[in-house]
Design a protein with these regions (language model features):
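Phosphate-end processing signature that detects enzymes handling 5′-triphosphorylated RNA
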Residues: 1-205
Length: 205
């Protein structure tokens, strides 16, 4: 495994008004960028079934991201990407709205002989005061204790023994560590803020 390059990961999470507990939520949408750049913008959907996770993504432009934040979803309905069209339905019919921005630095490692990816997420923090993932000036709140990070081990078929042997005994069981939940809970004092006062509207189908 060659020495990886760290990168900044900034993600705006969207959820339903009545479902904010990331532990029970089986489906989450998010818009992700890297290093505060608009070179790559992804709309992602993460589905969870028991301990297994399935991810899909579709590309967005900066202009499209701005339109989504402004509550303009019409372009999603006519997108060539099915994920965008389904996101349109979620926003219009199920009132899906942005809830929190999750920021962190990631160090990725990939095992050459297999489909194993190990990531170390450091300086995990919740951005508050807005949902513009490109705004690097938003205030942030750290969510982890000093000296701690989130390690994720991702694999598609099986976890090689060489990797399993590196993990502490208790970590060899499948567990969930949601950065979304950590950040949402950290910013919980803002829950009295009325999201619907920010110009959000529900467009007609």
């Amino acid at each position: 495994m060659p020495q990886p390059e760290n990168y900044q990961n900034s993600t705006t999470y969207f959820t339903y008004p009545e479902k904010v507990d990331g532990v029970l939520l089986r489906k989450k949408y998010r818009i992700r960028i890297y290093d505060y750049s608009d070179r790559v913008i992804k709309l992602e959907r993460k589905r969870k079934s028991d301990s297994w996770i399935y991810k899909e993504d579709a590309p967005l432009t900066h202009e499209q991201f701005d339109r989504i934040l402004a509550g303009d979803y019409e372009f999603l309905r006519d997108s060539e990407h099915q994920l965008c069209r389904e996101f349109y339905v979620e926003c219009v019919c199920n009132v899906m709205r942005p809830r929190v921005i999750v920021d962190y630095e990631r160090e990725p490692w990939i095992l050459d002989a297999g489909t194993v990816r190990i990531t170390f997420d450091m300086n995990v923090r919740a951005a508050v005061g807005g949902f513009d993932v490109f705004d690097a000036t938003l205030p942030v709140l750290p969510v982890l204790e000093p000296g701690k990070l989130v390690m994720e081990v991702k694999f598609t078929e099986f976890l090689p023994q060489v990797v399993r042997d590196l993990l502490p005994g208790k970590a060899q069981e499948l567990t969930s560590a949601s950065k979304y939940v950590l950040c949402y809970d950290k910013a919980s004092y803002l829950r009295g803020f009325d999201y619907w006062q920010e110009g959000w509207s529900v467009p007609s189908l």
